[in-house]
Amino acid sequence: MKNSVNLFMQGIFCIGVLCLSSCQGKKANTNMTKALAETSVKSEFYGFNSQVEWGEHLVLIGGCHDCHTPKKMTSHGPVLDTTLWLSGHPANMPRIDIDRKEVEAKGLAVAMDLTEWVGPWGISFSANLTPDPTGLGNWTEEQFIYALRNGIAKGIPGSRPILPPMPWEMIRYMTDDEMKAVFAYLKSINPVDNIVPAPVPPTSVVN
């Protein structure tokens, strides 16, 4: 009888150990699966947690804010106006007061916030890149990629060329995945209602 009880208790103990091991194994497998999934996502987006985060990184290192974000002037120089993030040349900003003919013949002139440029091509204004309808709100991903690959405004075949200083000739070498990430980020930021002025032809054409 005593041996039977001992055998029974040993059996219960073994079952308990097996159940515990099984639970721990399942938990370990779940954790491993989760870790592998997170690693896979980060690998897909080059170490970032999402396509949007990767796109934000590309926008920052690409210097897009240099021209597309208006600035506030301070005693330390211009600083980015975070309320107008990537919204382009402000519609209500006065034009640069210069002798355009002389500037276009000799070089270029730039507004203090770097959103207006005057040169041999005429006057160009930094575009609104926010998801507002006055910016990229109605753009498709395909249009965005076409614009950057071909230097064509609004990504519509037959439209005017993208004007300087937009460095699309270099940006065109980004991969499709990089461009898609940038577009995803731009679609995620705060929309800003800002109708950027249309470019102005050079004086040589006007006259």
Residue spans for each PLM region:
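Bacterial signal peptide processing site
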Residues: 24-26
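C-terminal motif of bacterial Sec signal peptides marking the signal peptidase cleavage site
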Residues: 19-22
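Electrostatic cytochrome c docking/interface patches
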Residues: 34-60, 74-76, 138
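Gly/Gly-Pro-rich "capping" loops immediately C-terminal to redox-active cysteine motifs
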Residues: 73-146, 162-175, 205-207
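Bacterial N-terminal signal peptides that target proteins for export
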Residues: 1-12
